[in-house]
Amino acid sequence: KGGVGKTSLCSAIVRELVEAFPGKRILAIDADPAVGLSTALGVHVEHTIDDIRNEVVQTSERGEYRQAIEVLNEARFRIFDTMVECDGFAFLAIGRPEAAGCYCSVNSYLKEVISMLANDFDYVVIDGEAGIEQISRRVMEQVSHLVLVTDQSAKGVNVCREIKEAADDLITYERIGMIVNRVVDPSMNDLVKLDGVDVLAYIPTDPIHAANDIHGKSVFELPEDSNIMVGVHQALHNLGIF
């Protein structure tokens, strides 16, 4: 569910991969319309995937169909231009649709983008939106590792259960696990469980990370022994990535 620290953990995963596998091609995709991953990673974004989609839509609406087809045919090259090359990884933002209402057209485009780019990178880390929308629309049809994030609340675990049930029916994944983030009372950890899903890590509330957020600092400025970095390292180890 929203507010459990999903984007913060995703940025920490990117950092862990960058530091553990120098020289590997790593792509971070911000697929959440809340667009927070760029800030967490310290990336400045000028253009998004939705900018390209909007150009196709607008040229079509103006009746300029030949130009719209040309833009569509050039999409692969335009997408690479949209990527931000950072120190050790590339970053791609899907963007927030300008029009109010359904986000499904962007999700459909995102599905094609992920399929197109996956083979060009050794690791692709996707920060999806909260809830089951992108799973239900099969935005990520095939993933190696599906990481669910919750806090200690029953509501958070219920959302994770819904995501797993949807994933079991609609997509293909090799490994699944759950991170319990923002743990306030460790004595309650045994109550946070989901059938068929291993808990990868219990991560206590992290005051250092909270201070980082207040000052607008990126995940790369966190000390290695901060709760979030220690927890994410443990989670990746339990997933078999390390």
Each predicted region: which residue ranges?
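Walker A (P-loop) phosphate-binding loop of P-loop NTPases
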Residues: G2-G3
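Active-site signature of alpha/beta-hydrolase-fold catalytic machinery across serine-
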Residues: A12, E16, A40, R138
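Hydrophobic positions on the alpha1 helix immediately C-terminal to the Walker A/P-loop
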Residues: L9
